[in-house]
Amino acid sequence: MRRRIKPIVVYLFFFLVIGGLILSDHQHHRQVESQVEKTEKTTQTSETEKNKVVEERLVSMTLEEKVGQLFWARVPSSHQLEDLQSYHFGGYLLFGRDFQGQTLEDMKALTDRYQAASKIPLLIGSDEEGGTVTRISSILETPFQSPLELYQKGGMEAIRSDTRQKAELLKSVGINAGLFPVADLASNPSAFIYDRTIGQDAQTTASYVEEVVTELQKNKVGSTLKHFPGYGDNGDSHTDIIQDNRSLDELRQADLLPFQAGIDAVRIVFWFRTIFYPRLILFRHRSHQKSMIFFAKNSTSMELL
């Protein structure tokens, strides 16, 4: 009798242990699932609350205020505060002249005054590509290096570290949007845009763009992809009328990939370039501006807000 009881006790112990493990594992999974569901509900509630705030603000806005919010204006040389109140701009863009002779403390005080003068919080942006295009870091002892130099020295890790430093600096002076990264491709080192690119192929540039915009978003700084749909090896469109004879298929195979990577990663701003594309049929019956917006919407997964 004792011999029969002993195996039964062993089996019972075995099933209790295994059953306990299964029950414990099940409870753990339920806790994890419950936490995930709670997080998702919190996120949905947060988004709903944000949308509600925006909708309430829109209802209370005048037509003039709504129109003004469409403009991201360069800071005028005079009457900066008055213009914010008169035209209800959505934001101000800070360029080289705005930083001349200023300290970081001066810039923070300046952006604080801009925000205080605006009824609606401003989007304050500035170029800080690094290298040949620096704004705020130009008043520092050591300006930021170009993405080309950084990538050659330290790869993507150097890019990530640099982006974090830029985000911290911009936020410290009240700048909440960066007019970078440059998403252009250029194969010719003598091309106008080459020194401002990462100097790599489409796939590597796409990875670079994704890293930068994601890092900026983590640090709560906006980003801008430029110059859509890609400068290529063309000349300087600031000083001349440039014609790009590439087809839509050619652009899709390479130049558009970095822009798509940025769109897939975060909500993004596009910076368009003024170059004529005779091989794109969509330009025949539209103004240049409408054509570029139509092209951006239909050649990428971009949603126009």
Placement of each model-derived feature along the sequence:
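Sec-dependent N-terminal signal peptides of Gram-positive bacterial secreted proteins and lipoproteins
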Residues: 2-29
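N-terminal, intrinsically disordered, polar/charged segments of Gram-positive cell-envelope systems
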Residues: 23-68
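Short leucine-rich amphipathic alpha-helices used at interfaces
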Residues: 42-44, 49, 80-81, 86-88, ...
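Second-shell residues forming the walls of enzyme active-site clefts
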Residues: 62, 100-112, 207-305
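Loop/turn elements at helix/coil->beta-strand transitions in domains of secreted/extracellular proteins
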Residues: 66-69, 87-92, 118-122, 171-176, ...
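Short, hydrophobic beta-strand segments that form beta-sheet elements in well-ordered domains
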Residues: 70-75, 124
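Short, acidic/polar
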Residues: 74-86, 158-169, 251-258
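Enzymes and membrane/adaptor proteins characterized by extended Gly/Ser/Thr/Asp/Glu-rich
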Residues: 86-205, 232-244, 273-283
